[in-house]
Amino acid sequence: MGAPPGYRPSAWVHLLHQLPRADFQLRPVPSGFAPQEQEYQQALLLVAALAGLGLGLSLIFIAVYLIRFCCCRPPEPPGSKTPSPGGGCVTWSCIVALLAGCIGIGIGFYGNSETSDGVSQLSSALLHANHTLSAIDHLVLETVERLGEAVRTELTTLEEVLEPRTELVAAARGARRQAEAVAQQLQGLAFWQGVPLSPLQVAEDVSFVEEYRWLAYVLLLLLELLVCLFTLLGLAKQSKWLVIVMTVMSLLVLVLSWGSMGLEAATAVGLSDFYSNPDPYVLNLTQEETGLSSDILSYYFLCNQAVSNPFQQRLTLSQRALANIHSQLLGLEREAVPQFPSAQKPLLSLEETLNVTEGNFHQLVALLHCRGLHKDYGAALRGLCEDALEGLLFLLLFSLLSAGALATALCSLPRAWALFPPSDDYDDTDDDDPFNPQESKRFVQWQSSI
């Protein structure tokens, strides 16, 4: 099959494509991209379910750890203010985990941007392909209308002027037949006219979904960043209420991180299967949606020497007919104008129409060549399966770092806030200290009584 320009599956695609797949009954499933088949759908759902399994194991581990911490902690002697051994290690482990989470957030922002760039490249390729197809339809319609107008007006007028000379009328009628033949052949070149599938609509739908996906990830990243920063602030200020609130928020973000991880993993595996051999699926799907012949679709999607141009015969016949019209008009101008001066005006108008038609014809030849649309196809593949897939892998790394960091923080935070001094300890200050809040209050009352 013809490879689009720059079409090279990456090492990540090969690695993900080689991963084993199974359905809900744990039976092996082929790695070919077949989203319409139930077994393949179950295989992707099973990949996503692995993240749910990881979430369940994380919650069980955190629950067991916290229960052991609460139930098996030795009682502190009354009035003891000596910090328990290992308290500093617990706090620092929590801080390191949160800093690792911040690094993961940076990776997540980069991955989100890469994914958005890849989807934008896909949308741009679809818009460019839509422009090419619209230009073909417009040129065909304009040329056919111009030829029809010439047949109805100039050629009819010319036949009326040349009526005394039957051989000249026969030549004019020959030009009419050739013009009608050209119009008929050109109408068959607008292969996308009336097709229900619109690349413009697909691009708009893709952009619409991508906007909400990008926004959702930005909100998730910002939420985790705020949780990490406020947790660090609570640890620095030894604020129990802030740390408790951030612990609850960390649990929420942990669930969201595992959920996004499952979605990213399933999408990455599906994209790798698609990108390993995209041509058969794209050909079949486009043929189902458009109803176009496989010859036309194979010519544009494969674009190699093994597939001939399905419009070559129409283009050849149109070019020959235009050449015949040109020679007939030259003969009429040479024979008829000296005898019928009034024939010069319709002949000049016909020559002008012929020149415009030939110009449009050469543009159609260039637009109908497979290079342009095949290049758009390659750009769409590179955007979706290189940039977008790379971004998904970075988002997957972010979710993994986030889940690990938050799980560590959830285990460490309860032990950290247990080491915070109680609020009563702040009242145990020297009465002679001028910065003592109680002493400052008595000083203000003394000044007001003077």
Swiss-Prot record:
Residues 65-88, 236-240, 412-450 are cytoplasmic. Its main location: membrane. GO terms for molecular function: intracellularly calcium-gated chloride channel activity; volume-sensitive chloride channel activity. Calcium-independent, swelling-dependent volume-regulated anion channel (VRAC-swell) which plays a pivotal role in the process of regulatory volume decrease (RVD) in the brain through the efflux of anions like chloride and organic osmolytes like glutamate. The keyword Transmembrane applies. It comes from Macaca fascicularis (Crab-eating macaque). The modification Phosphoserine is found at S440. The keyword Transmembrane helix applies. The record marks R165 as: Essential for the formation of the channel-pore. Glycans are attached at N130, N284, N355. Pfam families: Tweety. Residues 428-450 are annotated as: Disordered. The chain crosses the membrane at residues 44-64, 89-109, 215-235, 241-261, 391-411. GO terms for cellular component: chloride channel complex; plasma membrane; smooth endoplasmic reticulum membrane. One of its GO terms (biological process) is cell adhesion. This is Protein tweety homolog 1. Homotetramer; disulfide-linked. Homodimer. It is found in: Cell membrane. Belongs to the tweety family. Signal peptide: none annotated. It catalyses: chloride(in) = chloride(out); L-glutamate(out) = L-glutamate(in). N-glycosylated. Contains high-mannose, hybrid and complex oligosaccharides. Disulfide bonds join C303-C370. It is a multi-pass membrane protein. Residues 1-43, 110-214, 262-390 are extracellular.
